Curated annotation (Swiss-Prot):
Entry protein name: Serrate RNA effector molecule homolog
Gene name of the encoded protein: Ars2
Organism: Aedes aegypti (Yellowfever mosquito)
Principal location: nucleus
Described purpose of this protein according to its UniProt entry: Acts as a mediator between the cap-binding complex (CBC) and RNA-mediated gene silencing (RNAi). Involved in innate immunity via the short interfering RNAs (siRNAs) processing machinery by restricting the viral RNA production. Also involved microRNA (miRNA)-mediated silencing by contributing to the stability and delivery of primary miRNA transcripts to the primary miRNA processing complex.
Protein family (similarity comment): Belongs to the ARS2 family.
Length: 937
């Protein structure tokens, strides 16, 4: 029993050992191990009662349990719970709800890496952490804590307003200093760079306007309607504009009439051409069989012709063909072995034979079946062969007549070649060719008998060798031609997906088709000239477009590099991916072609009422944009300007006589007298079908195309396509009217559509208004002369009495006046830079839409009446800001928090705050007393 007790104690001591060994990593102290050791070693204590384990069934294997084998969950802490992260709960956070930005009060950028926020909870939105914001401004309570206690309320409010204004000035100045050296910022506000950019954009605009006027004079604009049913003419017009903008001529416009090459049908032809080059074994066997059958037919015809023509010939001469047959059979078998060893079959020349001859030979081959070379020697003895010979004799006679008629005006040589061509598949057939020559001589005239057969054989061999040499030369020429054709086809299939811009001669150029690469990452410090220098090394480079930076992307920019259509764009993209520009990965990818260039909008836009409203809106936008850039200003300088008169003062041909279509006409008096006004009101309530006015639509289409071509504004999409002249696809996308609805439309729906559309296009009607001088002074506008004076004082240093130093040159002078003169004379360019810097900063302040960091969420607290929490004007419990609480349950505002007592005047218009439950009034009164409950009502 002792052994069993020891074993039981060991098991009891090891009860939690497996779990603790896995959890030793979470700070298991030495004192805990010491406490457990004494209990394990106390084996002498008695156990009067059974242990609880005796009543349990035997344990089973639990397997892997991460909750048991790992440390407890209460010990796990997130990465963002360190000292640098914000507390999740509690009302003592200085920067409001969102934390982890590490902003200093006197710095624009966070203390950590550029653009990277502090610790964020994983469940918070990532966009909230990536956004750069201004540092949090002190609240009034925090500001008063820094002031003297004896300050009055009016002074405190005045000082706090001054603090807020100074804080805003500081943020604007810091943003300017941080971005003034970046190219995108210079193009907007620098006095020299911005002027160059404006001149460049005006040149693009002027060029577009000239192209539009040219197409308008030719009548191309009036032929096109902006409807999805008119997609092809609309795309042709846009492509015509692009070709004209690229400097194309009328000859280049013929490219638009060419049908696109079907790519799918051409690509599979490449393997078919390769199969034709190599003859298979079956083809060689078929050619051998055909040649053997032809030999058999001609040999069988020979004795018949000799019997019919020359019956008086001796028997010795009639036996010659049989001997020749045996020799030919031997030669055929020898040649077969050679052909098996070297399968180089020569193709026959079927072009010289007539089509009838081919058909008849095919029929004769099918009738004769598959006869072998072994049966050719005994063919004359078989009855079936005799029947076949009779049929073939008749066919041969007809063929000879036809060939004689064809070769009559020519020489008899082509006839011989035509007969010998099928025999050229087998080499060294001299005896048979000699027999054929004798037969032809017998048909034309009486032949002279030859003394010996050897002379005939030698002559025939010489003629055959000459013919073979000619045939081999012909075959080589044909093979060379086929190989050249295959090379050309392979070259075509290599660039089959590209439309080549052929500039040879006067051939039209596809200038509207380009290839492009999209650069996803361009650091703010990278300039356009650097990207152009990098891409100019590749052939076919055209232009570069770089977008404005985005705050959400840490002021990184995107770029598009345009090349000609015939370049290998994937190879260029691969090379650009291996380049780092200013230690920045460009992220180059191939930019796809536009999928849908004409996109539909609501078909309700073709209704007469909406069209008239759109004409008014289009005319206002066109006039406003023309006036903003001064497009038609040269022609308007003589007359007085009137901002509301579109066609009266403007020389724009699209806006002329536009007032005729802006005024509605109606027979109101007649309708009133006849009582038709009430009926019209009923019809408007019931709805009306979509009415299309062709004349109004033509006027509207000219305005829409003018905005799209000249100002890059897609009217029906209510948006502008910026820097389109530098993008890969100029005039790429346009939105057009879709099919009209079939159901009736009420007047309320029409008015709602017009009101919504005008609201979306309101940004194009707003005129650019600069800040007033007083407002600019409040924001810290600088004076040029004052800044120059500061610059001179900073560069005038007193070393000793009557000893002054100019740090710019290191020279010493006797007085400060001499240093001033020296700076103006020798360092005048530095003074000019100071003046330009002042103008640079003031231009930034003037812009009402200037870029800047967004305010911190803690700075934009709403009034209690606007964002009334359930606490009726008091601060939300647990320090949670009501307007910025994350939209997930564990960290949202507590719903069971106690509600505070409402104050008079708080809430929305004196009403009870949302979610507050009023406590019922409890009255204590004596039951013997009369009821005075009215006093509590």
């Amino acid at each position: 029993m002792g052994d069993s007790d020891d074993e039981y104690d060991r098991k009891r001591r090891d009860k939690f050992r497996g779990e603790r060994s896995a959890g030793e990593s979470y700070a298991r102290g030495a004192d805990r191990a010491d406490r457990s050791r004494g209990r394990d070693e106390w084996a002498e204590r008695g156990r009067p009662r059974q242990d609880y384990r005796d009543y349990r069934p035997p344990p089973r294997d639990r397997g892997y349990s991460p909750t048991r084998e790992g440390p407890p969950m209460k010990r796990m802490r997130g990465d963002g719970w360190g000292d640098d992260a914000r507390p999740r709960f509690g009302g003592h956070e200085p920067y409001g709800m969102y934390g982890g930005y590490n902003h200093d009060h006197f710095g624009m950028h966070p203390a950590g890496p550029y653009g990277h926020p502090g610790g964020l909870h994983p469940r918070e939105q990532q966009s909230a952490g990536d956004m750069q914001t201004q540092p949090c401004m002190m609240t009034l309570k925090q500001f008063l804590a820094t002031q003297d206690d004896s300050i009055s309320d009016s002074e405190a409010i005045q000082k706090y307003n001054d603090y807020k204004l100074e804080f805003k000035r500081q943020q604007l100045n810091e943003f300017f200093v941080a971005h003034k050296d970046e190219e995108w910022f210079k193009m907007k506000y620098h006095p020299e760079e911005s002027l160059k950019r404006k001149e460049e954009q005006f040149g693009f605009l002027k060029r577009r306007c000239d192209v539009f006027v040219e197409l308008l004079d030719h009548g191309d604009i009036s032929k096109v309607s902006v409807d999805t049913s008119n997609t092809d003419p609309l795309l042709r017009l846009l492509d015509t504009v692009v070709i004209k903008l690229e400097g194309g001529t009328d000859e280049d416009l013929k490219v638009l009439d060419e049908k696109p090459v079907e790519i799918v049908k051409i690509l599979p032809e490449k393997p078919k051409v390769e199969v034709k080059k190599e003859p298979t074994l079956e083809d060689t066997i078929k050619k051998e069989k055909i040649s053997i059958k032809e030999e058999k037919v001609e040999e069988a015809d020979k004795p018949k012709e000799e019997k019919d023509d020359d019956k008086e010939k001796p028997a010795a001469e009639g036996e010659e063909p049989e001997g020749e047959k045996n020799d030919a059979e031997k030669e055929v078998t020898a040649e077969r072995e050679d052909m098996d060893a070297e399968p180089a079959a020569k193709e026959p020349e079927p072009e010289e034979e007539p089509s009838r001859k081919k058909d008849r030979r095919k029929r004769s081959r099918s009738d004769s079946g598959s006869s072998s070379s072994s049966s050719s020697s005994s063919s004359s003895s078989d009855s079936e062969d005799e029947k076949e010979k009779e049929k073939e004799d008749k066919e041969e006679e007809e063929e000879k007549k036809e060939t004689e008629e064809e070769a009559a005006p020519k020489s008899p040589k082509p006839v011989e070649e035509g007969e010998k061509e099928p025999q050229e598949e087998v080499e060294n057939n001299g005896h048979k060719s000699g027999d054929e020559e004798e037969a032809t001589k017998k048909d034309q005239a009486e032949p002279e008998k030859m003394d010996t057969d050897e002379a005939v054989v030698e002559n025939n061999k010489e003629s055959e060798e000459a013919e073979k040499e000619k045939d081999t030369s012909k075959d080589e020429e044909e093979a060379n031609k086929e190989s050249n054709e295959d090379k050309q086809e392979s070259e075509k299939t290599e660039t089959i997906d590209l439309v080549k811009d052929t500039t040879v001669g006067n051939s039209p150029r596809a200038l509207h088709r380009t290839s492009s690469i999209f650069l996803r990452n361009l650091a703010p410090s990278i300039t356009k000239a650097e990207v152009e220098a990098m891409c100019k090394r590749y052939n076919g480079f055209l232009r570069v477009a770089i977008a404005d930076p985005l705050l959400e992307r840490r002021w990184f920019r995107r770029g598009w590099v345009t090349f000609r259509r015939d370049v290998n764009i994937k190879e260029i993209c691969w090379n650009l991916n291996n380049i780092r520009l200013r230690d920045c990965e460009l992220g180059a990818i191939v930019n796809k072609d536009l999928s849908r260039r004409v996109r539909p909008v609501n078909g309700l836009t073709c209704h007469k009422t909406i069209v008239r409203s759109d004409i008014k809106l289009c005319a206002k936008i066109a006039h406003n944009l023309d006036d903003k850039v001064g497009l038609w200003k040269e022609q308007e300088d003589n007359g007085e300007k009137n901002g509301e008169s579109f066609g009266l003062q403007s020389k724009n041909p699209v806006l002329q006589n536009i007032t005729d279509y802006l005024i509605e006409e109606a027979s109101a008096e007649e309708d009133e007298l006849l009582g038709l006004s009430t009926e019209a009101a009923k019809k408007s309530n019931d709805g009306e079908l979509v009415e299309r006015d062709t004349q109004l639509i033509e006027v509207l289409d000219k305005l829409i195309l003018y905005l799209r071509v000249v100002h890059s504004i897609d009217f029906y999409n209510h948006c502008e396509y910026p820097y389109e002249d530098e993008m890969p696809n100029r005039c790429g996308i346009i939105h057009a009217r879709g099919p009209p609805p079939q159901n009736k439309v009420t007047s309320n729906e029409i008015q709602e559509y017009i009101r919504t559309f005008e609201g979306k296009m309101g940004s194009f009607l707003a005129r650019a208004v600069d800040l007033e001088e007083e407002e600019m002074k409040k924001l810290g506008a600088k004076d040029a002369e004052a800044e120059v004076e500061k610059f001179i004082q900073a560069n005038t240093q007193e070393l000793a009495k009557d000893k002054w130093l100019c740090p710019l040159s290191g020279k010493k002078f006797k007085g400060p006046d001499f240093v001033r003169k020296h700076i103006f004379n020798k360092h005048n360019e530095k003074v000019d830079e100071v003046r330009k810097e002042v103008e640079y900063f003031n231009n930034y302040l003037k812009d009402t839409k200037r870029p800047q960091l967004p305010e911190h969420p803690g700075n934009t607290k709403k009034a209690p009446s606007d964002a009334a929490p359930p606490t009726a004007g008091y601060r939300p419990p647990y320090g949670m800001a009501h307007a910025y609480a994350p939209m997930y349950a564990p960290y949202a505002q507590p719903m069971m928090a106690p509600a505070g007592r409402a104050r008079p005047g708080f809430g929305r218009g004196g009403r009870e705050p949302m979610g507050e439950i009023r406590r019922p009034i409890i009255a204590y009164s004596d039951l013997d007393m009369p009821n005075f409950s009215d006093s509590f009502l």
